[in-house]
């Protein structure tokens, strides 16, 4: 079986932190994975940047997998290995880390809440999102949406 290949992508505003880039380089050098390409979009309209990168990857794809790293997150070879070792094209074609936000941004002490959700049906025949909280520790779980 041929070695699976990977592309890495991120968006930024024109600059990235040294810790972010050190994490990217460490993953590339220490993972033993064949990286096909790095994809980067610079700008200040994050939704448009993300669309541009994912469209380019789909249309010009030369890798089996895409690793998307937010440019304000530091990834380590150990964290990457946890994601990589749990990939499965049939059962888990998308694996996400957990990001946090808050429901009370105006409070002096914000409570971090995971941006992990499941879809729920509503009375009108549509759907909604329900936050998955609390999260189990150190486990992969199936969710409807993350980010």
Question: Regions from the language model: what does each represent?
Answer:
Residues 51-65:
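Active-site nucleotide-sugar/metal-binding loop of Leloir-type enzymes
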Residues 63-74:
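Short beta-strand-to-loop acidic/aromatic patch adjacent to the donor-nucleotide binding site
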Residues 76-147:
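Conserved catalytic core of nucleotide-sugar-dependent glycosyltransferases
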Residues 44-49:
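A short, glycine-/small-residue-rich helix N-cap motif at loop->alpha-helix starts
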Residues 23-26, 52, 82:
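Alpha-helical elements of Rossmann-like donor-binding domains used by nucleotide-donor carbohydrate transfer enzymes
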Residues 13-15, 73, 100-102:
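Residue-level marker for beta-strand->alpha-helix junctions and adjacent short loops that shape enzyme
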Residues 1-43:
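N-proximal low-complexity "stem/linker" segments adjacent to membrane-targeting elements
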